[in-house]
Design a protein with these regions (language model features):
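Short linear interaction motifs
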Residues: 73-78, 109-123
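Generic structural signal for short, solvent-exposed loop/turn connectors between secondary structure elements
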Residues: 74-75, 103, 128
Length: 430
């Protein structure tokens, strides 16, 4: 007997990462894909969003490819080749996920599904192919060894075939009989029949899996075409600036609706806060100038956001407010979160977190806690606005604190300071 051979596949992990990068490049467009293709015509879930399923496919492929690459096959530790059975089941997860991505994105794989280059098994009726033969092997050897019946007239003529064992050939007495890597026996459940031999060659199995995995390239190209087409479609639909008879809050609501359609609803809360800012009127006249500057900053950000929606792009000064922003955010989002890392705020991380208790959505106890934490910052924030802790409402204190944080950001090296124009209508005079 010869020394036992082992087998190990290598699937390029970069292939799934490249596909994932295509998804992420225009995630807001990818999220709009639904189960609408003809293949889902009779499914109860036809028409619902497919984003979760797409993400599941990507995660399953990524994890399972890593697992398959780590498996060394051919170690006969039990009666049957359980390592191969496990390998086939997990490889099927990858191939099924790729098939699902093709169906969702509308990629026709009929030609690829008819391919016979790996196994060369066209079947008794000439209608077989690599895809069907792989599924037959998995059914017979792994998942349905006591009842394989879906491949009648293709890979068997009996109504049912069964498989008592699957064993590695090399390094065993069987290699003197069978010139293959694995041998399985398929009983056909007929009188006076010894059944049929099924010979498995690992180079053929690996070749088929690698080919089906490579179809991610074709599916990725189709995804990019879908994204480009959808973006161009949106660009052709006008998004008017604020109309003469349109209130500012109505204008913000309209842009919010447009963004939800084109980019998703991730920025809904930012639009809601923009409306709150533009409708805010301070109680103290001492704060009116600072409030107006803050409103103007939001108006400027909304102008940029209008460009984002019209051009379907978040990059560049005319959209994000600055070039090469590593955060991936636009000014519109920076204003909402106002994350300025500077020495004067460095010791107040907990306080800044609790200021959110004053936004009107928290309970009375939390709001009281927010007031305490705001007072502790009065020595910093009070340089920019006037707080009246006795008479101001929670929401007014919250809005004033946000205005103070905005003006602090204008004094430091951060995205907001870089994006806001050097104009007194946005910035306090020195």
């Amino acid at each position: 007997m010869s020394e036992r051979k082992t087998f190990q596949i290598h699937l390029d992990p970069e292939l799934i990462e490249e596909f994932n990068a295509s998804l992420d490049a225009h995630e807001h467009i990818s999220e709009q894909i639904s189960f609408v293709e003809r293949t889902f015509e009779k499914k109860s879930y036809r028409g619902i969003p497919a984003w979760d399923c797409i993400c599941v496919c990507v995660h399953r492929i990524r994890d399972t490819v890593g697992y398959l690459n780590s498996q060394v096959l051919g170690k006969m530790e039990h009666g049957s080749a359980f390592d191969f059975i496990n390998f086939m089941n997990n490889a099927s997860v990858v191939l099924d996920s790729i098939d699902m991505l093709a169906k969702i994105i509308g990629v026709d794989l009929s030609q690829e599904n008819a391919r016979t280059a790996a196994f060369g098994q066209i079947g008794v009726n000439g209608k077989g192919g690599d895809k069907k033969y792989f599924e037959f092997l998995r059914s017979l050897c792994a998942v349905h060894p006591v009842e394989t019946n879906r491949f009648k007239d293709v890979y068997h003529t009996a109504d049912i075939v069964t498989c008592p064992y699957l064993t590695w050939v090399s390094g065993s007495p069987l290699e003197m009989i069978w010139d293959c890597d694995l041998h399985a026996h398929a009983f056909v459940n007929e009188a006076n029949s010894w059944g049929e031999d099924v010979c498995v060659y690992m180079d053929q199995v690996f070749a088929h899996i690698k080919y089906r995995y490579s179809l991610l390239n074709k599916i990725g190209c189709a995804l990019e075409r879908f994204q480009d087409g959808k973006i161009e479609e949106f660009r052709k639909i006008p998004v008017p600036a604020r109309l003469a008879d349109e209130t500012e809050t109505a204008y913000v609501d309209r842009l919010k609706g447009v963004e939800a359609e084109r980019f998703g609803s991730n920025n809904d809360l930012v639009y809601d806060f923009a409306k709150a800012v533009l409708s805010f009127e301070p109680t103290s006249p001492a704060n009116k100038t600072a409030v107006e500057r803050y409103k103007n900053a939001w108006r400027f950000a909304l102008d940029l956001q209008l460009n984002v929606l019209r051009d379907m792009s978040r990059e560049g000064i005319e959209h994000a407010g600055i070039n090469d922003d590593d955060t991936g955010w636009v000014l519109f989002e920076h204003l909402e979160y106002c994350n300025c890392r500077c020495d004067e705020l460095s010791g107040f991380g907990y306080n800044l977190e609790k200021l959110g208790y004053l936004d009107g959505t928290s309970g009375e106890s939390d709001a009281a806690r927010g007031r305490v934490k705001l007072k502790e910052m009065d020595c910093i924030l009070g340089k920019h606005v006037v707080f009246d802790y006795e008479n101001d409402s929670d929401t007014e204190l919250y809005m004033l604190s946000r205005i103070a944080l905005y003006e602090i950001a204008l004094e430091h090296n951060c995205e907001i300071n870089e994006a806001i124009p050097l104009d007194r209508c946005y910035r306090p005079q020195k």
